[in-house]
């Protein structure tokens, strides 16, 4: 009948409108997700010469959005566009931090740390174009924190905390890691290196219990300052000249 034809026509129009609306929503979402990096950023590394080279590195966690695997990305135009840098990362796991050498302009070196069953540390000496595991001597490869500081005109020192409460040290002149704080039931939650490390060799670490440990000889000897009353330490910054 005429009434049935009109009803069917309106029903088809209604279904078509719903389909187009959903299609537009999907396309819009794809456009949004196409802007990389769109995943949660777990680490940020900035070139010390950013003013001139506009170079940034980010570590993303794509598994949270089910869109991609964890990635290391680089931008050389201040973040306008990004390039994935997976070459050599056979077992990426979940990234925890990314650090750029203080001598990046000359040594092109970048470090990335991983959690879980990954290699612990990846190192690149060509601005992220390729990576190699850097974990000789590293017994615990669940790395939660890594800090880097200039230790000479062309040298740097690295301090690394895995999940077992110990602290490791390495440097630009070493190919391995060595323990400078023994394992403990209290994990290391924060590492801070002095901005004047070349002069004062100062490193401060905080444990999950609140204990502060200070070294003024680059991590060889440590002074436990105890637990600040009622303190939960989330971060430490050392002022220049102190």
Predicted segments, located by residue:
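N-terminal secretory signal peptides that target proteins for export/translocation
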Residues: 1-11
């Amino acid at each position: 009948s005429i009434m049935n034809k009109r009803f069917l026509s309106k029903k088809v129009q209604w279904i078509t409108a719903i389909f187009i609306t959903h299609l537009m929503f999907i396309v819009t979402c794809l456009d949004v997700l196409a802007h990389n990096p769109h995943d949660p950023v777990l680490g940020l590394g900035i070139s010390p010469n950013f003013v001139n080279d506009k170079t940034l590195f980010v570590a993303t966690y794509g598994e949270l959005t089910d869109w991609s695997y964890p990635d290391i990305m680089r931008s050389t135009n201040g973040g306008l566009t990004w390039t994935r840098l997976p070459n050599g990362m056979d077992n990426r796991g979940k990234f925890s931090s990314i650090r750029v050498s203080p001598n990046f302009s000359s040594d092109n070196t970048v470090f990335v740390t991983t959690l879980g069953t990954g290699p612990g540390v990846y190192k690149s000496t060509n601005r992220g174009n390729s990576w190699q595991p850097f974990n000789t001597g590293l017994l615990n490869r669940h790395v939660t924190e890594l800090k880097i500081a200039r230790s000479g005109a062309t040298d740097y020192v690295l301090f690394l905390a895995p999940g077992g409460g110990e602290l490791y040290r390495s440097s630009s002149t070493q190919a391995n890691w060595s323990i400078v704080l023994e394992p403990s039931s209290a994990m290391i939650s924060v590492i801070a290196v002095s901005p004047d490390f070349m002069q004062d060799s100062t490193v401060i670490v905080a444990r999950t219990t609140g204990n502060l440990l200070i070294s003024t000889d680059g991590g060889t000897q440590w002074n436990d300052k105890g637990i600040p009353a009622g303190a939960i330490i989330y971060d430490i910054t050392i002022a220049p000249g102190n």
